[in-house]
Design a protein with these regions (language model features):
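Structured adenosyl-cofactor binding patch, chiefly the S-adenosyl-L-methionine
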Residues: 109-153
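N-terminal beta1-alpha1 ligand-phosphate binding loop
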Residues: 1-28
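Catalytic beta-strand/loop module used to bind and position nucleotide/cofactor moieties
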Residues: 76-78, 83-110, 118-126
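A structural signal for isolated positions on well-ordered beta-strands in alpha/beta enzyme cores
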Residues: 2-6, 35-37, 98
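S-adenosyl-L-methionine/SAH cofactor-binding core of RNA-modifying enzymes
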Residues: 33-96
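Catalytic-core regions built around general acid/base machinery
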Residues: 20-27, 89-94, 114
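Conserved strand-to-helix beginnings and helix N-cap segments that scaffold or border functional pockets
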Residues: 17-18, 84-85, 112, 132
């Protein structure tokens, strides 16, 4: 199984969260290969200066090339919240799962409709770097549930 976390975020290791990110990728390894793909380019930076709508379009353009051949899940605060067992079902029996974390302005509705599902981690706002860690923990928890690993107990 392959799990990709595709995020609008500047590339590079964050000294605070990088050890946690690597920790969750490592402990998930018996169940899945987990990769974090950070997307941020001049086009996204320029779009941020134009308007929220332009920014959303730039996120879609950067992310849509990852949509084919995977089960695609967008993180969207206005979507349905899942408990850990429901989240685990998203991962069950899938070859490739892509999770998308949008930029500061979220996703345009057209991108959300291209995804198989959109889920919410609640209405609070988290930094992108922290959301990466929270998502990785839930990915490992979901994999643990699916493989009867004691982590979730």
């Amino acid at each position: 199984m392959k799990i990709n976390i595709i995020i609008v975020d500047k590339k590079g290791k964050d000294q605070l969260y990088a050890p946690l990110i690597e920790h969750y990728k490592k402990i998930a390894k018996p169940f899945a290969k987990v990769e974090v793909i950070e997307l941020f380019d001049k086009e996204i930076a320029k779009a941020h200066d134009i308007s929220p709508e332009a920014a959303q379009k730039s996120y879609t353009k950067a992310m849509e090339k990852y949509l084919s051949g995977a089960f695609n899940v967008a993180l969207d605060p206005s979507s349905k919240e899942l408990d850990s067992h429901q989240f685990a079902k998203l991962l069950k029996d899938r070859g490739v799962v892509n999770f998308y974390i949008g930029g500061a302005y979220g996703f345009e509705s057209g991108f959300l409709t291209k995804c198989n599902q959109a889920v919410s981690f609640g209405k609070i706002t988290l930094s992108h770097k922290l959301m990466k860690v929270v998502l990785l923990e839930q990915v490992f928890r979901g994999l643990s549930i699916n493989h009867n690993h004691p982590y979730h107990k």
